[in-house]
Amino acid sequence: MSQTKMLKVRVTLFCILAGIVLAMTAVVTDHWAVLSPHMEHHNTTCEAAHFGLWRICTKRIPMDDSKTCGPITLPGEKNCSYFRHFNPGESSEIFEFTTQKEYSISAAAIAIFSLGFIILGSLCVLLSLGKKRDYLLRPASMFYAFAGLCILVSVEVMRQSVKRMIDSEDTVWIEYYYSWSFACACAAFILLFLGGLALLLFSLPRMPRNPWESCMDAEPEH
């Protein structure tokens, strides 16, 4: 591999590394969406919530003269509950809606697949750098691109999850906005998917410019 192409590969891997960090941050944090309830003038507190792939947290925030509940960063009584995705027979005290839990389980499972693709891609990159096996960059690029697509699907599932929660009559929340964990997931998709495609492009062997070039460059037979 030429020096110019190697430089492009290193820059691409750096972008992919940033995407990996953002993907990990999005998966382990619970600020994908912030939910706000309908405001009642006679209430002294309001209950806002934020949630991610693994748990939902509600916070009772003292009300002031504003017409909105929050922001979520204000001090208040906080209560978090894990979704308990893979423990049948157990249910969350807060997350009582079967359909909503199915959305969350799907998003979490897809995110785990994404992390698996990231691990496989990273192993291929490490093996290629260790013994100059440049051909391993090609499967690595595909793994990273698949990881990005999984993140995108997880983002869409969570988006539908939030919409379903807001539209449900069983919840008190009527307003929402996507928070920084959601932004990390979107940025991770862009970096992983485009980085994977760029890595595949840079790792492909150079095509001959002329039909006879490959024959002229071939080693003579003995």
Curated annotation (Swiss-Prot):
Subcellular location: Cell membrane, Sarcolemma
Cytoplasmic side stretches: 1-10, 130-134, 205-222
Tissue-level expression: Skeletal muscle.
PTM entry text: N-glycosylated.
GO terms of biological process kind: calcium ion transmembrane transport; establishment of localization in cell; positive regulation of muscle contraction; regulation of calcium ion transmembrane transport via high voltage-gated calcium channel; sarcoplasmic reticulum calcium ion transport
GO molecular function list: calcium channel regulator activity; voltage-gated calcium channel activity
Disulphide bonds in the chain: C57-C80
Xref: InterPro entries: PMP22/EMP/MP20/Claudin, VDCC_g1su, VDCC_gsu
Membrane-topology annotation of the record: Multi-pass membrane protein
Extracellular side: 30-108, 156-179
TM region(s), chain numbering: 11-29, 109-129, 135-155, 180-204
This protein's GO CC annotations: L-type voltage-gated calcium channel complex; plasma membrane; sarcolemma; T-tubule
Glycan-modified residues: N43, N79
Keywords annotated in UniProt: Calcium, Calcium channel, Calcium transport, Cell membrane, Disulfide bond, Glycoprotein, Ion channel, Ion transport, Membrane, Transmembrane, Transmembrane helix, Transport, Voltage-gated channel
Role, per record: Regulatory subunit of the voltage-gated calcium channel that gives rise to L-type calcium currents in skeletal muscle. Regulates channel inactivation kinetics.
Subunit (UniProt): Component of a calcium channel complex consisting of a pore-forming alpha subunit (CACNA1S) and the ancillary subunits CACNB1 or CACNB2, CACNG1 and CACNA2D1. The channel complex contains alpha, beta, gamma and delta subunits in a 1:1:1:1 ratio, i.e. it contains either CACNB1 or CACNB2.
Family under the similarity heading: Belongs to the PMP-22/EMP/MP20 family. CACNG subfamily.
Protein name per the record: Voltage-dependent calcium channel gamma-1 subunit
